[in-house]
A protein has these predicted regions:
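Amphipathic alpha-helical transducer elements in NTP-driven molecular machines
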Residues: 185, 234-235
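SF2 helicase/translocase NTPase motor core
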Residues: 1-160, 165-171, 199, 203-228
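PAPS/PAP-binding and catalytic site of the sulfotransferase fold
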Residues: 43, 74-75, 184-196
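Aromatic- and glycine-enriched glycan-recognition loops and surfaces
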Residues: 231
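Conserved helicase ATPase motor motifs in RecA-like P-loop NTPase domains
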Residues: 33-35, 170-185, 193
Length: 235
C-alpha cells in the first residue's frame, strides 16, 4: 500500500489489508464483521480509485434504516479532504430542492460525485430509473456498492433483479457485509451475481442450487416442486 495516500482517518492494519486485496479488482466483496470499519475501507477505495483517475462517480446503496449514516457521518468523517466532492442522496418523494441539488451534482466537473440511495428504492420504478440513468451516464468511470449486501440475497426479489441489471452498467462493483450467509449457502448466489455474471461459475441460480443443495421432490395433488432438505460440497 502506498504510504503517501492522504487518509482522512488513519486506517488500522486490517483495513489496509482489505484495501490492498481489492486493489486492481473491478469486483470485490468486503466481508468484514460489524465494527471493523468496512464503510471506511470502501470510502478509501473510492478515494484511491478517484486519485488514480479510474472513477469520478460512485453510488452507495444501503438499507433504509442506515443509509442516512453514509450522508451524515461516514462520508464526512472518512472521505479524503484533498478530493473535491459533490454528494447528494435519494429522497422520496423528491423535493424540488433535492432535484436541483442532484442536477448540480450531475453537471459538476472536476469533482468526485457520490450519490447515496436506500436499497428499498430499487423495488420502485423511480428508483430503478435513477439507477439506470446514473449507470448509463457515469458507469464507464463509476462504482456501485451495496452495503449490507444480504439485502439482495433473494434471487426472486424485484430489487435484487433490478440491482443485478444495473450493476452491469458500472465498471467497478463492491459489496459489504459482516457475513454473506445469514440463512443458507444459497444466499451467496445473488450477491456474487451482482459482482459479475457467472462469478461463481454457474449460469443460473438453479444450476448453483442443483450443485450445492440436496433436493427432494414434493407432490401435493397436481402440484409438484423441489424442496431443499440439505446441502453438500460446502466444506
Amino acid at each position: 500500500m502506498k504510504v503517501n495516500y492522504k487518509f482522512r482517518t488513519k486506517p488500522y492494519k486490517h483495513q489496509i489489508t482489505a484495501l490492498e486485496r481489492c486493489t486492481g479488482k473491478t469486483a470485490f466483496g468486503f466481508f468484514m464483521e460489524m465494527g471493523t470499519g468496512k464503510s471506511k475501507v470502501l470510502l478509501d477505495d473510492i478515494a484511491r480509485l478517484y486519485t488514480e483517475n479510474q472513477i469520478d462517480f460512485a453510488i452507495i446503496i444501503a438499507p433504509k434504516g442506515v443509509f442516512r449514516n453514509w450522508v451524515e457521518m461516514e462520508i464526512p468523517i472518512h472521505f479524503w479532504e484533498e478530493i473535491p466532492t459533490y454528494m447528494s442522496s435519494w429522497q422520496s418523494p423528491m423535493s424540488s430542492g433535492r432535484k436541483e441539488e442532484i442536477n448540480r451534482m450531475i453537471k459538476a466537473t472536476g469533482k468526485m460525485k457520490i450519490f447515496v440511495m436506500n436499497v428499498e428504492a430499487f423495488s420502485s420504478i423511480k428508483g430503478r430509473d435513477v439507477g439506470e440513468f446514473f449507470g448509463k451516464k457515469f458507469g464507464d468511470k463509476g462504482l456501485i456498492a451495496v452495503d449490507e449486501s444480504t439485502t439482495i440475497k433473494n434471487h426472486k426479489a424485484k430489487r435484487t433483479k433490478t440491482l443485478i441489471k444495473i450493476s452491469k452498467l458500472f465498471k467497478y462493483k463492491r459489496i459489504l457485509t459482516g457475513s454473506p450467509v445469514t440463512n443458507t449457502p444459497m444466499d451467496l448466489y445473488s450477491q456474487c451475481e451482482f459482482l459479475g455474471e457467472k462469478m461463481l461459475g454457474f449460469s443460473s441460480f438453479y444450476a448453483f442450487q442443483a450443485r450445492y443443495a440436496v433436493l427432494n421432490s414434493i407432490k401435493m395433488g397436481k402440484i409438484s416442486f423441489q424442496k431443499v432438505i440439505g446441502f453438500r460440497y460446502i466444506d
